[in-house]
Amino acid sequence: MKTINLISLDNSDVKYRIDRFPDGEVQFVLTEEIDRKEEYNVECRITNAEQLFILIQVGDILDRQGVVWVLHIHYLMGMRMDRVMSFERPFTLKIVGKMISQMGYEKCYVDTAHSIRTMLEIRECVSLETYPYKFLMEVVKEPDIEVVYPDHGALERYEGEEGDELYFEKERDIETGNIKSFIFKNEDVVNKGKCFMFFDDLCDAGGTFLGELEILKKMYPEAKFYIRVTHIVNEVGFDNLCKNFDRVYATESYRDWGKVAKEKGYDNFVVC
């Protein structure tokens, strides 16, 4: 299987270029012939409408060539807008899902989809999950780390049980929707309290993580604090995590954060 890597041309088996017309419109152009006997894997991130447009152009080329191909979306624009918020707002995920689903791929893989709605709106879609305890054993490889889920949604995502998992509940202001306080649940099952790892799918500005981190630091002042998220979508959040946690694990689904970490001198950031 050959890869068409829309994130990095250097890592693409199939070479291409992206032209831009005077009006700003982009056009994807293959610079070598497609082998119709070969299967293809398209790697991409969709953080904006232009990246989605480029992907659809790639799909058009592959479908007209009649080749078998699979799609791997590392970050999917609109996946947080997975419901109708009001009649005055669009159902963004449904719109994006329809555009992707019309392509002729065999299977679509999405890194840590925000909710099951992604699989319902995109044809033949599978979410690629990273589970906490497997991650600790295979990547971190340190003893005495206790997993903390930042909210009930994260707890449910990773199939934890309320009775024996550490997690936070958020108390919100009914009128404003702002978070008033965080409540740490199941403190009685804390084992050694030497190291805690927050685990979630996404970080925006990071306010929830920082508020909960402050509580745990007061409770366990000698402990180390790690965090693992799949998607960091905001440089403010990236800075907040790297400046406050002892170690930050994240993918480069949204942006090449490893390069940013080097530029800013964050030696506690790990791409995973």
Describe these PLM feature segments.
Residues M1-C272:
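PRPP-associated nucleotide enzymes
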